[in-house]
């Protein structure tokens, strides 16, 4: 069932962490969870042009700490920090507690699954061919270090009357392997023909249980490798297999005697 289950939920507490990190009593849990959902929807709408990959919400001691991972942190901060101050005020009004906002930059947006899905959905809304958008995203991800990528689009692709699903994959995407670092993202493209769903899986290598990358063993140096045997042509003739005449084990044929002259 590795093909069906959510890749992030499958790896929680193994190699991935939760995006909401707080504890609450049973009576408060539902309200705080709904609050988190409203905050995420607000940030998705407010920072639509800032290329936001993910949002982490923490609640330490009647406060809230929100970390926004963005490929364009300058758009979030704004000139002289004006935009982030207004964003902080809106979040405090939504959550009812003091809010501290951190901005983290995404170094390689071409390998972030959520940003890839959002980019493809924006291109589909601009009437770009879905195959071209998918293949271009795959090429960029593989060029910048991804070990594998899979993209799936579902809906009325190119405006056809019957909805279908198409997917492309390049490299390895081991969905059953728990230690595999699989980044997963989804998005929706609202076109004139209807909604098209995009799913993206990006394989970035294996991880240890603590979330760190495994230490790769160095390859043996050239001088430490076992010396190769000399080519067959460099060995002396007649001593190839310990037998005379090469490796066939037959002695060379003797020359035939010359015929006697006639009349003798």
From Swiss-Prot:
InterPro entries found in the cross-reference section: KH_dom, KH_dom-like_a/b, KH_dom_type_2, KH_sf_prok-type, Ribosomal_S3_C_sf, Ribosomal_uS3_bac-typ, Ribosomal_uS3_C, Ribosomal_uS3_CS
Organism lineage: Bacteria, Pseudomonadati, Pseudomonadota, Betaproteobacteria, Burkholderiales
Protein name: Small ribosomal subunit protein uS3
GO MF, one annotated term: structural constituent of ribosome
Alphabetized SMART domains for the sequence: KH
Described purpose of this protein according to its UniProt entry: Binds the lower part of the 30S subunit head. Binds mRNA in the 70S ribosome, positioning it for translation.
Gene Ontology CC annotations of this record: cytosolic small ribosomal subunit
Residue span, KH type-2 domain: 39-107
Family stated for the protein in its record: Belongs to the universal ribosomal protein uS3 family.
């Amino acid at each position: 069932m590795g093909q069906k289950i959510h890749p992030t939920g499958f790896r929680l507490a193994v190699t991935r962490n939760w995006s909401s990190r707080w504890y609450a009593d049973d009576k408060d849990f539902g309200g705080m969870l709904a609050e988190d959902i409203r905050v995420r929807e607000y940030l998705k709408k407010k920072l639509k042009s800032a290329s936001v990959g993910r949002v982490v919400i923490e609640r330490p001691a009647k406060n809230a700490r929100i970390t926004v991972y963005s490929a364009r942190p300058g758009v979030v901060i704004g000139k002289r920090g004006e935009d982030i101050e207004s964003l902080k005020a809106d979040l405090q009004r939504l959550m009812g507690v003091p809010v501290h906002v951190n901005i983290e930059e995404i170094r390689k947006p071409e390998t972030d699954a959520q940003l890839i899905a959002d980019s493809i959905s924006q291109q589909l809304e601009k009437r770009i061919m879905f195959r071209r958008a998918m293949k271009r995203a795959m090429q960029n991800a593989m060029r910048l270090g991804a070990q594998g990528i899979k993209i799936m689009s579902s809906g009325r692709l190119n405006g056809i009357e019957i909805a279908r699903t198409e997917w492309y994959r390049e490299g390895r995407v081991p969905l059953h392997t728990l230690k595999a670092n699989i980044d997963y993202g989804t998005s929706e493209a609202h076109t004139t023909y209807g909604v098209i769903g995009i799913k993206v899986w990006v394989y970035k290598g294996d991880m240890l249980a603590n979330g760190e990358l495994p230490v790769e063993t160095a390859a043996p140096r050239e001088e430490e490798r076992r010396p190769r045997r000399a080519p067959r042509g460099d060995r002396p003739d007649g001593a190839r297999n310990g037998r005379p005449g090469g490796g066939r084990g037959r002695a060379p044929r003797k020359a035939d005697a010359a015929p006697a002259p006639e009349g003798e």
